[in-house]
Amino acid sequence: MKASSMDTHMGNIAISNEVIAQYAGTTAMECFGIVGMAGMSVKDGFVKLLKKESMTRGIQVTLKNHKLTLDFHVIVSYGVSILAVADNLIDSVKYKLEEFTGLEVEKINIYVEGVKVID
């Protein structure tokens, strides 16, 4: 289990990267225009919409020098501005993750893997 950790005057706090990814994914799903996280099948190159339980597979968390970098692989709604959706996602996730973890979010990369028409 990879973990992001920080030292405090009372001891060490370790937060699993999986927990950070889950929190970031939940925050992302609250953003307008995000349909879900994308999982890529390396074998055949197909992109699939991940279920809520496995959405962390569409998010990669990296910690370097006490700063977080996140890679999101997302599917967006048809007809929305991808730039507006990405800006909203970055702002929301950065703010909420910094409040949640106490770590600085240095960079959020967004990879739009698909578009889905919502009924």
Show where each model-derived region lies.
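Contiguous, often N-terminal, cationic amphipathic patches that form binding interfaces
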Residues: 1-76, 82, 87, 103-109, ...
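A short beta-strand micro-motif common to beta-rich folds, especially ectodomain repeats
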Residues: 89-93
